[in-house]
């Protein structure tokens, strides 16, 4: 099963606004070459780094859960997964390192209910909590979270 990650309206606004601000900054610095190049380099680095983590879809295969990201996929074998269930990360959760809306939510977060996790999600209302046997946790999202959880749990029961 494969399901796309959709960005919430908040993420779309943050992404659009930040890109517009970067463009305005670059245009306004066109008379100062050193500032212009510094802002261009920072913009390229920010966007490239963000695209590396930006989640595009989630897929279950016979052997693993694949988190498709724009530039590189994250593969988690079912043998590493202990459980999958729905969750809603709190809006008051602490972002330790990552993005809180630009091209989705990605990075390390700490939530009072969930605990510390690495997030790859676009919409807080479509989240899945993936717990690994080693104690790590991932929060991912997709358009069909209930069906995705069912698919993951089916594969987990097959791999016991």
Where are these regions (language model features)?
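N-terminal membrane-targeting/pre-transmembrane regions
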Residues: 1-32, 132-137
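A structural detector for beta-sheet-dominated domains
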Residues: 8, 61, 68, 79, ...
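Charged, low-complexity, helix/coiled-coil-prone segments
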Residues: 21-28, 41-45, 88-100
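Non-transmembrane, membrane-adjacent beta-strand/coil modules in membrane-associated proteins
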Residues: 68-134
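Short, aromatic-rich membrane-interface segments at the entry and exit
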Residues: 32-40
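Conserved beta-hairpin
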Residues: 44-85
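A membrane-cytosol interface segment of integral membrane proteins
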Residues: 3, 112-160
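A signal for specific C-terminal beta-sheet/loop modules enriched in small/flexible residues
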Residues: 1-10, 74-93, 147-160
